[in-house]
Structures are given as structure tokens and as C-alpha cells.
Curated annotation (Swiss-Prot):
Organism: Rhodospirillum rubrum (strain ATCC 11170 / ATH 1.1.1 / DSM 467 / LMG 4362 / NCIMB 8255 / S1)
The name this protein goes by in its record: Crossover junction endodeoxyribonuclease RuvC
Catalysed conversion reaction: Endonucleolytic cleavage at a junction such as a reciprocal single-stranded crossover between two homologous DNA duplexes (Holliday junction)
Source taxonomy: Bacteria, Pseudomonadati, Pseudomonadota, Alphaproteobacteria, Rhodospirillales
Keyword Nuclease attached: yes
Keyword entries, A-Z: Cytoplasm, DNA damage, DNA recombination, DNA repair, DNA-binding, Endonuclease, Hydrolase, Magnesium, Metal-binding, Nuclease
Length: 169
């Protein structure tokens, strides 16, 4: 089964697709969707959404996962991140996929073994676990980490998401 991990950001949104067969996890693809900061906020959100729609069409994942938002010190940045996150989450939701959410510490613990792991530790573990990963940016590594986390926790998370959504695919 193919799982999509998403690491939303207004400038760069990371994405990663893994294949899960039994207890084996393999790399399918990873990359980023960039928005043009010269455009309006609405146009940038449309770019992010369209980019994730293209990923969904190209790789056909059956489930998606995203990292929960943390609150920045700058309220305007937090708001923009939330808007980007909404645009990114909307794509798989409209495609009928359940979208699971994980706290950053849970993602790090699932991949590195500790919830306080640094970004470079996450990237190093992703390269170890998924040797074919291209990891254009740390955002792509984070997205693959989110997908791996979902692979580990999906049974519980899927049940919770289905209960919240009242259904799913």
C-alpha cells in the first residue's frame, strides 16, 4: 500500500511516498512543491494545492499523513502556515483519502527513536531507512518521516480519523 507524507510550508511543502508491504517499507518518490513568493497568498495556496494534486495523480497513495502545526512566536507566520497546511491537506481529502495527523515529537520518535531529534538526525535516518530517497530538501526528508510514522501508527490513527470523519476510503 502506498502512503503519502506531507510537510506543509508556504514557501516549500515537502512530500514523500512510500510503499508498505507487510512490515517492509520502501521508497517510491519524494520531492517538494514550491510557491512563488511574488504571487498573492491565494495564488501561492493554489500552487501548493495543485502540486499535491499532481503528486496524488502520479503516485496514487491510498492514505496520507501530515505533521500537526506548531505555534510560532510570530502570529502572522503561524496563520500563513495554517493556511498552507489547509491547502495541502485539502488535496488528499478531496481525493477521498483519510488524512492522519501526528505531532512532530511522535514523528521524530517513530523514525529516530527520540521525540527531540534534530532535523539532521531525521534526514540521516531517512537516508538509512530509504536508500533511494533523493531528499531535495529537509522538507522532503520530513515528509518521508511522516509517511514512515504513519506506517507504524496507521491502525490506531486510521481508526481515530475514520471515527472523526464518519467514513473514508
Amino acid at each position: 500500500m502506498r502512503l503519502l507524507g506531507l510537510d506543509p510550508g508556504l514557501r516549500i511543502t515537502g512530500w514523500g511516498v512510500i510503499e508498505v508491504t507487510g512490515n517492509r517499507i520502501g521508497h517510491v518518490a519524494d520531492g517538494v512543491v514550491r510557491s512563488d513568493d511574488r504571487l498573492s497568498l491565494a495564488a501561492r495556496l493554489a500552487q501548493l494545492h495543485g502540486g499535491i494534486v499532481a503528486v496524488l495523480k502520479a503516485y496514487e497513495p491510498v492514505e496520507a499523513a501530515v505533521e500537526e502545526t506548531f505555534v510560532n512566536r510570530n502570529p502572522a507566520s503561524t496563520l500563513k502556515l495554517g493556511q498552507a497546511r489547509g491547502a495541502v491537506m485539502l488535496a488528499p481529502a478531496l481525493a477521498g483519502l483519510v488524512v492522519a495527523e501526528y505531532q512532530p515529537s511522535v514523528v521524530k520518535k517513530a523514525v529516530v527513536g527520540t521525540g527531540g531529534a534534530a532535523k539532521d538526525q531525521v534526514g540521516m535516518m531517512i537516508r538509512t531507512l530509504l536508500p533511494g530517497a533523493t531528499l531535495e530538501t529537509a522538507d522532503a526528508a520530513d515528509a518521508l518521516a511522516i509517511a514512515i510514522c504513519h506506517a507504524h501508527y496507521r491502525a490506531g490513527a486510521l481508526s481515530l480519523a475514520l471515527a472523526r470523519a464518519g467514513g473514508g476510503r
